[in-house]
């Protein structure tokens, strides 16, 4: 698969990114090189190889929860520019 400048422009639009002409050219080349490398990986013979999600065996190491004293509401809000009834007040984001 070949990455085109149109592909880069489309992805930039979806990500709401404004790219310069130089960035569009540079990213087109970089992404094309990455996909070419991935295509080479597809040529590997993986018959008999067990699919894994990690290259090395990984196990979850859980620990018991510890109840500890909290810093308290007053300390947590001490440097807050604005607060109401024990909560941070932030500017409205959605009208």
From Swiss-Prot:
<dbReference type="InterPro" id="IPR036113">
    <property type="entry name" value="Asp/Glu-ADT_sf_sub_c"/>
</dbReference>
<dbReference type="InterPro" id="IPR003837">
    <property type="entry name" value="GatC"/>
</dbReference>
<dbReference type="GO" id="GO:0050566">
    <property type="term" value="F:asparaginyl-tRNA synthase (glutamine-hydrolyzing) activity"/>
</dbReference>
<comment type="function">
    <text>Allows the formation of correctly charged Asn-tRNA(Asn) or Gln-tRNA(Gln) through the transamidation of misacylated Asp-tRNA(Asn) or Glu-tRNA(Gln) in organisms which lack either or both of asparaginyl-tRNA or glutaminyl-tRNA synthetases. The reaction takes place in the presence of glutamine and ATP through an activated phospho-Asp-tRNA(Asn) or phospho-Glu-tRNA(Gln).</text>
</comment>
<dbReference type="GO" id="GO:0070681">
    <property type="term" value="P:glutaminyl-tRNAGln biosynthesis via transamidation"/>
</dbReference>
<dbReference type="GO" id="GO:0006412">
    <property type="term" value="P:translation"/>
</dbReference>
<keyword id="KW-0067">ATP-binding</keyword>
<keyword id="KW-0547">Nucleotide-binding</keyword>
<keyword id="KW-0436">Ligase</keyword>
<dbReference type="GO" id="GO:0006450">
    <property type="term" value="P:regulation of translational fidelity"/>
</dbReference>
<comment type="subunit">
    <text>Heterotrimer of A, B and C subunits.</text>
</comment>
<comment type="similarity">
    <text>Belongs to the GatC family.</text>
</comment>
<dbReference type="Pfam" id="PF02686">
    <property type="entry name" value="GatC"/>
</dbReference>
<protein>
    <recommendedName>
        <fullName>Aspartyl/glutamyl-tRNA(Asn/Gln) amidotransferase subunit C</fullName>
        <ecNumber>6.3.5.-</ecNumber>
    </recommendedName>
</protein>
<dbReference type="GO" id="GO:0050567">
    <property type="term" value="F:glutaminyl-tRNA synthase (glutamine-hydrolyzing) activity"/>
</dbReference>
<dbReference type="GO" id="GO:0005524">
    <property type="term" value="F:ATP binding"/>
</dbReference>
<keyword id="KW-0648">Protein biosynthesis</keyword>
């Amino acid at each position: 698969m070949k990455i085109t400048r149109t592909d880069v422009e489309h992805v930039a639009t979806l990500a709401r990114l404004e790219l310069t002409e130089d960035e569009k050219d540079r990213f087109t080349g970089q992404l094309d090189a990455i996909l070419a490398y991935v295509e080479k990986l597809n040529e590997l013979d993986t018959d008999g190889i067990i699919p894994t999600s990690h290259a090395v065996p990984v196990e979850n190491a859980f620990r018991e929860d510890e109840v500890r004293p909290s810093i308290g509401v007053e300390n947590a809000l001490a440097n807050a520019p604005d607060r109401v009834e024990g909560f941070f007040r932030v500017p409205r984001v959605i009208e």
